[in-house]
From Swiss-Prot:
Residues 16-237 form the ABC transporter domain. It comes from the Bacteria. Part of the ABC transporter complex LolCDE involved in the translocation of mature outer membrane-directed lipoproteins, from the inner membrane to the periplasmic chaperone, LolA. Responsible for the formation of the LolA-lipoprotein complex in an ATP-dependent manner. Its EC number is 7.6.2.-. It comes from Chromohalobacter salexigens (strain ATCC BAA-138 / DSM 3043 / CIP 106854 / NCIMB 13768 / 1H11). PROSITE patterns: ABC_TRANSPORTER_1, ABC_TRANSPORTER_2, LOLD. ATP binds at residues 52-59. Keywords: ATP-binding, Cell inner membrane, Cell membrane, Membrane, Nucleotide-binding, Translocase, Transport. This is Lipoprotein-releasing system ATP-binding protein LolD. One of its GO terms (cellular component) is plasma membrane. It is found in: Cell inner membrane. The gene is lolD. GO terms for biological process: lipoprotein localization to outer membrane; protein localization to outer membrane. InterPro entries: AAA+_ATPase (IPR003593), ABC_transporter-like_ATP-bd (IPR003439), ABC_transporter-like_CS (IPR017871), ABC_transpr_LolD-like (IPR015854), MacB-like_ATP-bd (IPR017911), P-loop_NTPase (IPR027417).
Length: 237
């Protein structure tokens, strides 16, 4: 169920829209175009896999979609709002309300427990510690980590840390979740549980997912597979 400050979107409404998205980096005397006038629409409740060779720009794309980097040209709109029109403070608040991130490396805070890491986005949002930790326990249970909530990241296995990172991304009931190899550190059974959780969220809360992966099985599980090649996205046959 969507959080009170997250507007409800019906499945099939456009949740994410990219128009002319371009990212150019300066390398010495040359400009290198990583993304070239890219176009993408993702509907609420849709799960889209992005595949492509290493160095094709997949991580750059995720960073632009999440507002962690600014495009050289073009626009990203999420839940009807343009990221380009937001200052840094407004963008940070928007990310907290609308976007969940799961990276290939978990980026958990080492000095906090799993429970505290998962609750952190809700505390930043202004919820009480009691409210935030109750919701964090709920989502940790959904990823099979209810018994490990008091452990710090250094006391967890790689797969456990990844599950905590996934829980942290989902705890705010985001409109959009951006994932970079989300099941890479998980065994097959746990990965299956995570996929089922994603399926349920997409269907029930109209959360959209964009999943960067090299795993053909994970890609095939999604509603669409898009291939990034030479800065452009095309639907994979």
């Amino acid at each position: 169920m969507a959080s009170n400050d997250t507007p409800a979107f019906a499945n099939n409404e456009i949740m994410l829209k990219c128009e002319g998205l371009t990212r150019i980096y300066r390398e010495g005397p040359q400009d290198v175009t990583v993304l070239d006038a890219l176009e993408l629409d993702v509907r609420a409740g849709e799960r889209v896999a992005v595949v492509g060779s290493s160095g094709s720009g997949k991580t750059t794309l995720l960073n632009l979609l999440g507002g962690l980097d600014r495009p050289s040209a073009g626009e990203v709109r999420i839940a009807g709002q343009s990221l380009a029109e937001m200052g840094e403070a407004a963008l940070g608040s928007f990310r907290n309300r609308h976007i969940g991130f799961v990276y290939q490396f978990h980026h958990l805070l080492a000095e906090f427990s799993a429970l505290e890491n998962v609750a952190m986005p809700l505390l930043i949002r202004g919820q009480t510690r009691q409210e935030a930790q109750a919701r964090a326990r709920e989502i940790l249970a959904k990823v099979g980590m209810e018994a490990r909530g008091e452990h710090k990241p250094g006391e967890l296995s790689g797969g456990e840390r990844q599950r905590v990172a996934i829980a942290r991304a989902l705890v705010t009931d985001p409109s959009l979740v951006l994932m970079d190899e989300p099941t890479g550190n998980l065994d097959q059974t746990t990965a299956g549980h995570i996929l089922a959780l994603m399926d349920g969220l997409a269907a029930q809360s109209a959360c959209a997912f964009i999943i960067v992966t090299h795993d053909p099985g994970l890609a095939a599980h999604q509603d669409r597979v898009m291939r990034l090649d030479q800065g452009r996205l095309s639907e994979d046959a």
